[in-house]
């Protein structure tokens, strides 16, 4: 059995370093492009609509992030399961897992879309959305939620493609959809003056485009990756396997979102200059982190395929190569941002007070962003081996609970911005040590048991 095509990567034989690099870089590019497109969305609505429209879109960001992180995590479960079956050369199971994943995407997408129409306003009120923007915020969210089935189809469909080693075609779909989204934003907001509605409609249409492209690709693949729409049905066995991996990963993403809301509240306590400065520096942290996350996803998929194929020594090499790439490339990019911080930060602001806070964040957090590679790659390798709950628990404790304890104790006593910022590298070190230790224990258990 073969799932190879000119876009896929043979993960179970040959040199690893070049294949991991070829797989990870398009993933990093996808994340970076998505961030850039989101920035364009914000710029268009802020510049050509109104401050209320900008606030309405912004007030939804944490809630939308919460939902997206949950389902991206669940889609990771399908990636791991299908990659394992590819390694095992189990054609029947690949077919069942793919059709289960796509049907789960459709059902859950429609469920969130419908339920969201009823709970949009209560949830936004619960989050403390200001009265002067609540109506616009509800309007934006309700329109945005109409695209949830398509968001889910893209996430699950691209995860299926990545399980074969194909990370380029999901990138191409994202580029096309992102360009369409940007153009529609300009037309609907500037020409037709639809404001918040225009931004939301543009997002829905772009999600329809990206998901349609991914589904088209899958329906025109060769067996056993080929998607047959008439054969869509849920296999309980495959669903359980997908959820065992996916739910812990999704809940981890949700915990991150909740913790970030609390951290943002502490940043807010330092005033508007701190909020603006932190936001400016955070953009560069995102770009550096996207490299780490891409190699973590590579570790998941490569490890899962090779573990399924019984290539245990390659699993060890995958961990080492992914970690080195993530550390080096993230370190180089972070170093460029830190050394050129005056130039990069002034792209966003020239306000002297804002720059004071921006410099503190970029010097402390961005400089040490490469530390995230230790726990991200270790967690990715464990998920590839089929362990998802353990890395989720370690990450939640190390990167969420510890940070919340820090801001509720240390920052209460020493209310200084840089003291808040050192919370990040401290939590990264603690989480990294715990995660790498757990990885070696899990690896020894897996390889000893299978032998």
Where are these regions (language model features)?
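Membrane-helix interface/capping residues of multi-pass secondary transporters
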Residues: 42, 51-54, 91, 120, ...
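Small-residue hotspots at the loop-to-helix junctions and early N-terminal turns
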Residues: 49-62, 137, 141, 200, ...
């Amino acid at each position: 059995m073969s799932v190879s095509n000119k876009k896929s990567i043979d993960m179970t034989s040959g040199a690893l370093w070049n294949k991991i690099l070829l797989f990870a870089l398009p993933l990093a590019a996808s994340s970076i492009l998505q961030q850039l497109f989101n920035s364009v969305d914000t710029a268009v609505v802020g510049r050509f609509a109104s401050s209320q429209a900008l606030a309405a879109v912004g007030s939804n960001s944490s809630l939308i992030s919460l939902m997206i992180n949950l389902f991206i995590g669940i889609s990771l479960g399908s990636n791991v399961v299908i990659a394992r079956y590819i390694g095992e050369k189990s054609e029947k199971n690949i077919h069942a897992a793919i059709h289960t994943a796509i049907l789960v995407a459709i059902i859950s997408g429609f469920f969130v879309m419908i339920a969201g129409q009823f709970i949009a306003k209560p949830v936004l009120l619960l989050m403390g959305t200001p009265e002067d923007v609540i109506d616009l915020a509800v309007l934006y969210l309700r329109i945005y939620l109409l695209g949830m089935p398509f968001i889910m189809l893209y996430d699950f469909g691209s995860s299926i493609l990545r399980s074969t080693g194909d990370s380029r075609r999901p990138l191409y779909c994202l580029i096309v959809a992102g360009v369409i989204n940007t153009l529609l934003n300009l037309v609907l907001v500037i020409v037709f003056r639809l404001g918040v509605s225009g931004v939301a409609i543009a997002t829905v249409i772009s999600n329809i485009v990206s998901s349609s492209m991914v589904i088209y690709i899958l329906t025109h693949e060769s067996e056993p990756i080929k998607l047959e729409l008439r054969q869509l049905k849920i296999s309980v066995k495959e669903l359980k396997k997908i959820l065992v991996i996916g739910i812990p990963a999704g809940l981890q993403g949700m915990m991150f979102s909740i913790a970030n809301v609390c951290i943002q509240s502490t940043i807010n306590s330092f005033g508007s200059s701190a909020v603006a400065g932190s936001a400016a520096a955070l953009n560069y942290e995102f770009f550096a982190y996207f490299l780490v996350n891409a190699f973590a996803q590579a570790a998941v998929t490569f490890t899962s395929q090779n573990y399924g194929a019984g290539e245990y020594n390659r699993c060890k090499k995958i961990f080492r190569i992914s970690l080195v790439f993530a550390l080096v490339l993230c370190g180089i990019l972070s170093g460029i941002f830190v050394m050129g911080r005056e130039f990069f930060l002034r792209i966003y602001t020239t306000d002297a007070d804002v720059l004071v806070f921006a410099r503190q964040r970029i010097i402390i957090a961005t400089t040490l962003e490469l530390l995230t590679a230790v726990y991200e790659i270790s967690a990715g390798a464990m998920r590839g081996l089929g362990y998802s709950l353990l890395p989720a628990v370690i990450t939640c404790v190390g990167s969420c609970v510890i940070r919340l304890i820090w801001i509720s104790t240390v920052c209460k006593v020493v209310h200084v911005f840089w003291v808040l910022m050192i919370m990040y590298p401290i939590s990264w070190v603690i989480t990294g040590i715990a995660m790498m230790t757990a990885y070696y224990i899990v690896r020894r258990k897996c390889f000893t048991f299978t032998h």
